[in-house]
Amino acid sequence: MFELNNFDALQIGLASPEKIREWSRGEVKKPETINYRTLKPERDGLFCERIFGPMKDWECHCGKYKRIRYKGIVCDRCGVEVTKAKVRRERMGHIELAAPVSHIWYFKGIPSRMGLILDMSPRALEKVLYFASYVVLDPKETPLLKKQLLNEKEYRESIDKYGDDSFVAAMGAEAVKTLLDEIDLEQSSIELKEELKTSTGQKKIRIIRRLEVVESFRKSGNRPDWMVIDVIPVIPPDLRPMVQLDGGRFATSDLNDLYRRVINRNNRLKKLLDLGAPDIIVRNEKRMLQEAVDALIDNGRRGRPVTGPGNRPLKSLSDMLKGKQGRFRQNLLGKRVDYSGRSVIVVGPELKMYQCGLPKEMALELFKPFVMKKLVQNGLAHNIKSAKRMVERVQPQVWDVLEEVISDHPVLLNRAPTLHRLGIQAFQPVLVEGRAIKLHPLVCTAYNADFDGDQMAVHVPLSVEAQAEARFLMLAAHNILKPSDGKPVSVPTQDMVLGSYYLTMDKDGVKGEGKVFSCPEEVLMAYQCKAVDIHAKIKVRLKRVVDGETIEGIIETTPGKIIFNESIPQDLGYIDRTIPENKLKLEVDFLVSKKTLGGIITRCYMKHGATKTSIMLDKIKAKGYHYSTIGAITISTSDMVVPEAKRELLENTEKQVEKIQKMYRRGFISEEERYEKVIDLWTKTTEDVANALMGSLDSFNPIYMMADSGARGSKSQIKQLAGMRGLMANPSGKIIELPIKASFREGLDVLEYFISTHGARKGNADTALKTADSGYLTRRLVDVSQDVIVRQEDCGTEEGYEVSEIKEGNEVIEPLVERLSGRYPSEDIIHPTTGEVIVKRNTYMNEDIAKKVSDAGIKKVKIRSVFTCKSKHGVCARCYGMNMATSQKIHIGEAVGIVAAQSIGEPGTQLTMRTFHTGGVAGADITQGLPRVEELFEARKPKGLAIVSEVSGTVKMEETKKKRTIIVVTDDGEEVSYDIPFGSRIKVKNGDIIAAGDEITEGSINPHDILRIKGVDGVKNYLLSEVQKVYRLQGVDINDKHLEVVIRQMTRKIKIEDSGDTELLPGTMIDVFDFEEANKEILEKGGEPAVGRIALLGITKAALATDSFLSAASFQETTRVLTDAAIKGKIDPLLGLKENVIIGKLIPAGTGMTRYRSIQINTDDENIEEDSIDSIEV
């Protein structure tokens, strides 16, 4: 059986007039829509039932045939087929045009395809098409040239001069169609290739462009004259509906107006032609018809757009596809789904990690079909209809059935904006009273949810497969690690941290200090009877069974630590248990803060897996909430102690500032030096006041506890509360040299308050802008990398990518261990001293092996990387390495491209927006934060360009009065000099030895320069380290592999420079793998291979250059992408995720991959024993 969705690829092309007539069910001859009295469609009009099908199911227009029994009969009176009304969504009509018109996409697009293939300028073409000039079609014996333009006067003169039939000239689309008809594609292709060999410069570029269009037509089987339309297809009426409003008026789709204009003008033209009207009138009518068709296809592309009531431009066919509200993004990629609901969320601290609270009435509506089925199964209802009635009337027995249905049916919870894959997780529902969804506090971080009125959506997975995937892959208890860096995301926050911190503190001189207890239970009893304080240092006798023998001994601890350790596995490796005296020690014998909690969770996950970790987390959560309540840690103004030393510090600084001002007035220092010195002084003083404050706070001071534990607040906030606010920036970002000396505790005066409003306002404005920019960056990243899926186990590449520890100055930011763990080496790693092989190539390195390599003193290692992966589509599991979200090897089918895009985009909102101004120094404004990331991924020429050395050699400096020059002397003695503009800071010194591609002045480098000087590896390295720099500055950790995936997509295309004997055209972009394949083929035949060089594309360009036209069209520039694809007759292989979502197939990732869908199960019936059959429950 032919299934509509059962195809592997999709091709787009130009439609011939014959094809359009073949699609159509009849010609639309009248501009009428529906009869205003009967409200029935007019015959032969835009809604005609004879052409498009009946308005009502199984009912013809005249009413002769009603009911399903006449299915398929065509009424003899009105000619309407008796069928379902939904055929009005698929049946098309057509309009036969009295004169051909050109298709605006192919004439007006950039570059004009029609112009290129005819070798005419778009302006000349426009004159012909819109009846301003004649074009010579056949000069015959006259000295006129073919395709020469003649205006009315010249045409008349030529006819007078050469006689009536001496040459053929015409105007309008008919003339263009004749010219297009005459084109011999094979011949043109040969001629252009010959011309290409000899031409240069602009002429060469034009020939390449023309050749591209000619080759597209030649290879795709499209005919050039199909760019001129003889027949216009009319889309089905239910896709351009007309609906009656309350007041009896009609609302209609704009398309109907546009079609009406075309039909009106076409009919008028037919009439004029029949009457034999004068040429000038006919010509005007033809021009109007051309304009009407242009407006229908793409309104506003040429001239002023056609407007409807209220001067609103009408939405044409192109507008229906374009933009966020167009067909692609609104309906194909963003569908609304049934079995879903949304409500406000409230906190549910009593829930287990895998549970969520679902309001009863919501659950009943969501699980309605399941409840109805169960009611019938349990014999509570006789049939589905009565079951439905029971549910609708909410009879008491329905609730019991609902409990039963819900018991192991997970639901998905989603919070918008879904910035990464943890924005949708699965939970086991628990029915709750009220109308709010209850959410577990530990998943709030992943959702970025709080309970100030946030709403969340619930979705029900229906099929058994969907339920299984939700339970095994999406359950909240399984999603403990962040896919971007592999650190835990379900870390307790706020109260839970505060409670744990409070529990693990110790205090001197409190009740019960020094007491000795016989067992932990006795300690708890004493604490509950208030005989011992929770922070008292006590001794307790512990028993533990180790390797089958019981050990006992006395340890020193506090009741709080004993309570906290009840929920922690005692083998996490914090304590070396091989030392005898450590065997009984408590695992967590230190003060627990948010940071250390993260470490505890990571260790527990690595050692015991997700389930045990989620149980531990629930216990920590319960204890944290309980003891933060008991601790009663609150904020009061008396907790903000202004430090004694503050006054003295301020007075000293003021004296020093006065000294600096004096020096400036005497002319010893410049204005700039004065400003910098004053700023430095105040910065240091603010820091000193803060340190004095932190030193004076008691460790049991509630504000200090909150900040120190990481529950809420930070050192800088405490500094502002009780120290001094410090320096502020003015609206342009320059620091004002008058600091705010007061703290919030003391209160600000009017001027201080005014100064602080600048920053506050700028912060709010920035946040709003940042969210939109960050969202757009994520969208581009997703589009460029969405088809990167792990498609094979090993691509077999020998190449690797060299990594070493990352240093900034003398500080190691990322040690080698972090860069190696979870990867495969691409060559054997050999011990530098002993010479033994530590790790064989292609062996998975976990953290222990990576540590071993690092401890051996090895500084650089070549690893398998996404950069060097040879998989044609997607990547292979070896080059990718570890899946950050599970700390296991990655599985085939994982959509690593999307995960990479989300990992880079999600922290985007945390990055700053600002450009730092360095006090008016020319050319030194460096972009940072989000704009810098965008600049790198778009491969733009950055602001504040650095001068880069093109050669390697030694630096020589020359300074004259007018300018500074740096000369680089190469080893061969060749000198390359660079003029340094005033105000730039030089990075090199006299006599320095530098490599090609190194910066001479400070600033950002243009990535295209690095590509030119250092090659593709250099640019990949540069982009990776620069993007990482921005994120690291904000304290955001992103694993390198995510950036590698995106950067690989940016460097996948090659620009052909010389085609050799291949079919490739010079100047065109082609995929690296296709390029290598084409060359391999030619070399086997003994021909000359093509030459090209890697092109660095920005993410927008790279996303549009994908093989899939569906994906590109749904991203940006829809009309341009589709025009290009149609002419080339492109085939979309449907390999990525977007294109499959668009056509409604399962995405080829995870269990939707073809290799998983095509598994066959063979059961050998004979070998199953009789008695074992019963035990298998399905």
Swiss-Prot record:
Q: Name one GO molecular function term.
A: DNA binding
Positions with a binding annotation for Zn(2+) 2: 795, 869, 876, 879
Cofactor list: Mg(2+); Zn(2+)
**UniProt xrefs under InterPro entries:** DNA-dir_RpoC_beta_prime, DNA-dir_RpoC_beta_prime_bact, RNA_pol_asu, RNA_pol_N, RNA_pol_Rpb1_1, RNA_pol_Rpb1_3, RNA_pol_Rpb1_3_sf, RNA_pol_Rpb1_4
Highest taxon of the lineage: Bacteria
Q: Which UniProt keywords apply?
A: DNA-directed RNA polymerase, Magnesium, Metal-binding, Nucleotidyltransferase, Transcription, Transferase, Zinc
Give the record's cofactor note, including how many are bound.
Binds 1 Mg(2+) ion per subunit. Binds 2 Zn(2+) ions per subunit.
Where does this protein hold Zn(2+) 1?
60, 62, 75, 78
Q: Name one GO biological process term.
A: DNA-templated transcription
| EC number(s) given by UniProt | 2.7.7.6
**SMART domains with a match to the protein in the record:** RPOLA_N (SM00663)
GO CC annotations? DNA-directed RNA polymerase complex
**Catalysed reactions, as listed in the record:** RNA(n) + a ribonucleoside 5'-triphosphate = RNA(n+1) + diphosphate
**Which residues are recorded as binding Mg(2+)?**
450, 452, 454
Query: Entry's Pfam families?
Result: RNA_pol_Rpb1_1 (PF04997), RNA_pol_Rpb1_2 (PF00623), RNA_pol_Rpb1_3 (PF04983), RNA_pol_Rpb1_4 (PF05000), RNA_pol_Rpb1_5 (PF04998)
Q: What do we know about how this protein assembles, alone or with others? A: The RNAP catalytic core consists of 2 alpha, 1 beta, 1 beta' and 1 omega subunit. When a sigma factor is associated with the core the holoenzyme is formed, which can initiate transcription.
Query: According to its UniProt record, which protein family does this protein belong to?
Result: Belongs to the RNA polymerase beta' chain family.
Q: What does the UniProt function comment say about this protein?
A: DNA-dependent RNA polymerase catalyzes the transcription of DNA into RNA using the four ribonucleoside triphosphates as substrates.
Name of the molecule in the record: DNA-directed RNA polymerase subunit beta'
